[in-house]
Amino acid sequence: MSDKQREAERQQSEDKAHSEAESAEAGQAPEAQAAEDGAESASGDSGDELTELQQALEEARARAEENWNECLRARAEMQNIQRRAQADVEKARKYAVEKIAGDLLGVKDSLEMGVKAAKEEGADPQKLLEGSELTLKMLSQVLERFNVQEIDPQGERFNPEHHEAVAAQPSHEHEPNTVLNVMQKGYALHDRVLRPAMVVVSQKAPEPPPSGSIDEQA
């Protein structure tokens, strides 16, 4: 083989290798571009997810702040309600007897006039009695308006919830534990006893001795 032939074969081999290299590079280029495009797409998706997460976080923070502010407002309102309720209770306790005190002023005025009249020279006892009875009637009316009832159990059966026995007397005419005498009236407010009535109650009297027993002893 001549030198020219060998040179031609070498040149042909180089051209073939160069052509194959170019073909390989051309085949790798789309793959590299696809990989680069995929990386860019993945990066874009990650960025979108991060943006969405940040937006969701901001919305959650805003809702949390709104809920906290509502909680603070509710607590402040509750404290105001408690203060108003406490003030109302204190006011009710302080002025609980305001109405009855106002009604009792008329009774006091009547008593003062009666005392003044009694001190005058030549005071008429009958008029003083009438004035006292009128004052007592006024007081009874005031008590009735406030649901204060008398406990006057004359002749009734003894009730330990409303009466207090201060003495007992034998009696043939009454059943045992009958109220014989009311020493002091009691009073009740609605169903609550303010003061029990002080009473004398009956007890069973001893049986009289059989008739004729004295004659037999004599």
UniProtKB/Swiss-Prot annotation:
Bias type Basic and acidic residues, positions: 1-21
Membrane-crossing residue ranges in chain numbering: none
Keywords in alphabetical order: Chaperone, Cytoplasm, Stress response
GO annotations of cellular component type: cytosol
Keyword hit for Lipid metabolism: no
GO MF annotations in UniProt: adenyl-nucleotide exchange factor activity; protein homodimerization activity; protein-folding chaperone binding; unfolded protein binding
Main localization of the protein described in the UniProt heading: cytoplasm
Quaternary structure and interacting proteins, as annotated: Homodimer.
Protein name as annotated: Protein GrpE
Originating species: Alkalilimnicola ehrlichii (strain ATCC BAA-1101 / DSM 17681 / MLHE-1)
Gene that this polypeptide is encoded by: grpE
